């Protein structure tokens, strides 16, 4: 039953949103095994400046009826993407790679991460993801990008 619900999400979500979720999943899947584990969530949370305890981590993963692969991740978190703070969450995921706090990342670095982490993006997926992305001078503006994919039209947080 969970598999049916999870696969149904793929037909309901816009392709852009699925691509963004794939990118988020890849960033969270720290050990690159195709599944988000308690250790992955702990590592990403610590990088974002928050250290949840084991009880919190267990509660986060409890929503999944089994191992949290990409399809299950989509099923559980896609509803949260339409909420008011989802854009902030996406920006924060990008921001963890933005050591200079410029709100821009080297596009080649982002592409390298997506090609070599978790759900390795192929060339077509990469082209689709960045087709209309705000890139200027080799810098990817993740604030504009998240506003664009979320449809908020806002360029600043």
From Swiss-Prot:
Domain EF-hand: from-to ranges: 16-51, 85-120
Record-level Gene Ontology MF annotations: calcium ion binding
PROSITE patterns for this protein: EF_HAND_1, EF_HAND_2
Binding site for Ca(2+): 29, 31, 33, 40
One Gene Ontology CC term in the entry: myosin complex
Annotated Gene3D superfamilies: EF-hand (1.10.238.10)
Superkingdom, taxonomy of origin: Eukaryota
Coiled-coil regions listed: none
Keyword set, alphabetical order: Calcium, Metal-binding, Motor protein, Muscle protein, Myosin, Repeat
InterPro entries to which the protein is assigned, alphabetical: EF-hand-dom_pair, EF_Hand_1_Ca_BS, EF_hand_dom, Myosin_RLC
Role according to the record: In molluscan muscle, calcium regulation is associated with myosin rather than with actin. Muscle myosin contains two types of light chains: the catalytic light chain, essential for ATPase activity, and the regulatory light chain, a calcium-binding protein responsible for Ca(2+) dependent binding and Ca(2+) dependent Mg-ATPase activity.
Other facts noted in the record for this chain: This chain binds calcium.
Protein name: Myosin regulatory light chain, striated adductor muscle
């Amino acid at each position: 039953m969970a598999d049916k619900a999870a696969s149904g999400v793929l037909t309901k979500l816009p392709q852009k949103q699925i691509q963004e979720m794939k990118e988020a999943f890849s960033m969270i899947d720290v050990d690159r095994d195709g599944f988000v584990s308690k250790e992955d969530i702990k590592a990403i949370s610590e990088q974002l400046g928050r250290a949840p305890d084991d009880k919190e981590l267990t509660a986060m993963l409890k929503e999944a009826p089994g191992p949290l692969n990409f399809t299950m991740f989509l099923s559980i978190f896609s509803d949260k993407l339409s909420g008011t703070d989802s854009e902030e969450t996406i920006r924060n995921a990008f921001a963890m790679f933005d050591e200079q706090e410029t709100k821009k990342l080297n596009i080649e670095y982002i592409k390298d991460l997506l090609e070599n982490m978790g759900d390795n993006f192929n060339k077509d997926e990469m082209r689709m993801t960045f087709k209309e992305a705000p890139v200027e001078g080799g810098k990817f503006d993740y604030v504009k990008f998240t506003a664009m994919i979320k449809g908020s039209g806002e360029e600043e947080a």
